[in-house]
């Protein structure tokens, strides 16, 4: 596990720099995480970081009402896009995405609910251990979680996608 933490930290630093530029040109599309009717008359795109306390507050205080009154009634198509301010938020996103679109929102709900626990767990290993617990609740195994966290191509694609979204929509903070 110590090797995994060293690898993840090294890959994170590299990806946020020069490899992100490469991802712009040769990346496969990143799956949009969508709730609600894809043909709804209104589209809301939320930009959030898994480590952002204000994003966690939005997901506990505002999002449930938005979901019940607008998303589940077919009035709104809700798109969730991650923002990567730090490696911990990136790792959380990678684990949530590893579970696929059907389980993604359940996992991020848990990640926001338990954000104070996992994001303050201490060192890298402790944080990955806490994030892995959430992934396991969604049915992911250790091998799946480790494979997702070590997938450098996916990381490169996500970083390129994130940077393109930030530039296109001029996102400077979260939640947006």
Predicted regions and their residues:
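Extracytoplasmic thiol/disulfide redox context detector
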Residues: 2-86, 159-163, 167
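Short beta-strands and strand-loop turn motifs
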Residues: 47-49, 146, 176
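Short, intrinsically disordered, charge-balanced linker/junction segments flanking boundaries
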Residues: 23, 175-176
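Cysteine-centric redox/oxidoreductase cores and disulfide-bonded domains
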Residues: 84-173
């Amino acid at each position: 596990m110590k090797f995994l933490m060293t690898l993840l930290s090294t890959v994170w630093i590299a990806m946020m720099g020069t490899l992100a530029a490469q991802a712009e040109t040769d990346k496969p599309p990143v799956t949009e995480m969508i709730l609600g009717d894809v043909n709804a008359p209104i589209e809301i795109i939320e930009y959030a970081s898994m480590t952002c306390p204000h994003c966690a507050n939005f997901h506990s205080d505002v999002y449930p009402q938005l979901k019940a009154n607008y998303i589940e009634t077919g009035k709104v198509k809700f798109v969730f896009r991650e923002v990567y301010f730090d490696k911990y938020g990136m790792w959380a996103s990678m684990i949530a995405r590893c579970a696929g679109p059907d389980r993604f929102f359940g996992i991020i709900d848990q990640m926001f609910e338990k954000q104070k626990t996992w994001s303050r767990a201490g060192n890298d290993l402790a944080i990955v251990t806490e994030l892995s617990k959430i992934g396991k609740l969604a049915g992911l195994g250790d091998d799946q979680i480790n494979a997702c966290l070590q997938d450098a191509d996916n990381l490169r694609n996500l970083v390129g996608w994130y940077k393109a979204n930030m530039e296109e929509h001029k996102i400077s903070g979260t939640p947006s």
